Amino acid sequence: MKKSLLLAVLSVCLLPLWGQANLSQIDSLVRKMLPEASEVGISVYDLTAKKSLYTYHDTKLSRPASTMKLLTAVTALSRSDADNPFCTEVWYDGVIEHDTLQGNLYVVGGFDPEFDSLMMDSLIEEVITFPFSVISGQVYGDVSMKDSLYWGHGWAWDDTPEAYQPYLSPLMFCKGAVEVTVVPGSQQGDTASISCKPASSYYTMTNRTKTRTPSAGKYSLSRDWLTNGNNLTVTGNVSTFRKDLVNVYDSGSFFMHAFLERLRAKGIVVPESYGFTELPADGVEQMARWETPVQKVLNQLMKESDNLNAEAMLCRIASQATGKKHVTAEDGIV
C-alpha cells in the first residue's frame, strides 16, 4: 500500500519538475515514503531529448509484474499492422448437397480474448445461413496458432481456479470462465439459488449453501481443479447476493462444446463429439468470421490489467513479428 502511495506521490511531485536538470528531490521522497527494507526502482527518461534525467536502482532486476502489460501494449501499437482485428473463423471442406454438409467443419482460433456468448451466437448465425441442417463429417477446432502451454510464464499454479488465470487457448470463450450468481433464499436455512453464465452442459454444479446460516461456514466457490474437473462447487453461508467467477478446464474444449451445443439448438444435426486438428491448406472455404477490434482488447488489458488479454496480445505480436503460423510466448519477447 505504501509503495502504491509512493508511486502516486512521485507522479504528482514530478509534474512540476519536468524539464529541470536536477531531480534530486525524488531522493527525499524515496527516503520518506518507502517502508524500511522494501525496494523500488525509478527511471525518469526524457523522450524528446533522448536522455536519462534520474535513476534510482534502475538496473536492479525484479520479478516481472503487471507493468509488463504496458510494454506489451506499446509494442503491439508500434507495429504497422496494429489495427488488425482479432479473428475467429469457421471453414468447411467437402460439398453441401441435399441439405447435408458432406464434409468437415473447422473453427480456427485467433486467440480473441474478448470472444463471448453474443459473439458465439453471431458466428453461429452466419454458419446457419448455409443450406444444410446435417453435418456428416466431423467438427474440429484449430488451436494451432500457439503451443499447448495453457498458462503464461511465471503464473502460479495454485492461482487456479481463479478467473484471472484462465487456461490459455487460441479458442477462448467467455474468457475461459463461468459467472456464478448466488441469491439467498427467503428463509434462514434455505438452499441459495444459483444461476450460471454462460449456460452449458460442459460443467456441472454442486450447491451446498445455506441462507443466513453462519454455522454453514464461510462462503466458497471452487472447482475440482486438482483433477482438471469441471464440477463447480458452491458451499457455505449465503447472506447476500453474490456474483463471482471461476475458470474451467480447458478453454479450447469449452469453446468447442458450446459451439456444438448452439448448433444443435438451431436445429443442426452435428456429431456427438468434436476433435482438434489444423485447418487443411487446400480444399476449404470460409463459412463465417468474427472480428474483435484491437481497441476492445486493449481497453480490458490496460484498464483492468487483464492477464488473458496480455497473453493474447503477446501471442499476436509473436505471430505478426515472426510471420510464423505456430508461435510461442517467447516468439513475442525475443
Which ranges hold each PLM region?
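Active-site SXXK
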Residues: 50, 64-82, 139, 171, ...
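Short, well-structured active-site flanking segments
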Residues: 78-93, 102, 272-273
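Bacterial Sec-dependent N-terminal signal peptides
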Residues: 1-25
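Solvent-exposed loop/turn segments at secondary-structure junctions
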Residues: 48-49, 60-63, 96, 111-115, ...
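A small/polar active-site loop signature that marks catalytic segments
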Residues: 213-334
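Beta-lactamase-like hydrolase cores
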Residues: 20-60, 86, 126-130
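Polar, glycine-rich mid-to-C-terminal structural blocks
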Residues: 108-218
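Soluble periplasmic/extracytoplasmic beta-strand elements of cell-envelope proteins
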Residues: 41-45, 55, 104-108, 138-142, ...
